[in-house]
Structures are given as structure tokens and as C-alpha cells.
Amino acid sequence: MKAAIHQNHGLLTCSRHSIEAAAFWFIALERCCQQQLMIDATGVAPKLVPPDKARFSREHVGSEYIGWLHFQPIWGQLVATQPDMFD
């Protein structure tokens, strides 16, 4: 398990290998939640992803390495735009 949604508390993510991966999973889950709220606001029934396609996506995009890798541009942007972060 990489993430949990706690009622009245918010999101929690984790990683076995790196803080970067946990941070990326948090950002990705936050974006998913935002998308879900926008879909719900339309009043249209969402089109669900078939289980086999969801499983394929998890197996190819859900690895710890991919989480770490996808956080690298975010980290680069933070370092470039917030240099005082290290003071």
C-alpha cells in the first residue's frame, strides 16, 4: 500500500525506498482527488477504468523507481525557484 485517505485527516503516502517517491505519490493522489471532485461536480457518472487496464497501469507506472523518477523534475524546480530553502 502506498497511500491512504483518512476521513477528517487527509492524505497519507509512504514509500519503502525514498522520501522522493512518497512525495510524488502524495502529489499524484492530491491531483487524483482534485480530478474526482471536478468530475463529481459535473453530475455526470464517471466512466470507470476496467480492472485489467488499471492493473496494467499499476504494474508499469506504480513502481518505487517511477515514483522517485517523477519527483526529480519537481525537486529541480523547487531548488531553482526556492534557493533560500536550504538556509
Each model region followed by its residue ranges:
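A conserved C-terminal secondary-structure "cap"
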Residues: 2-87
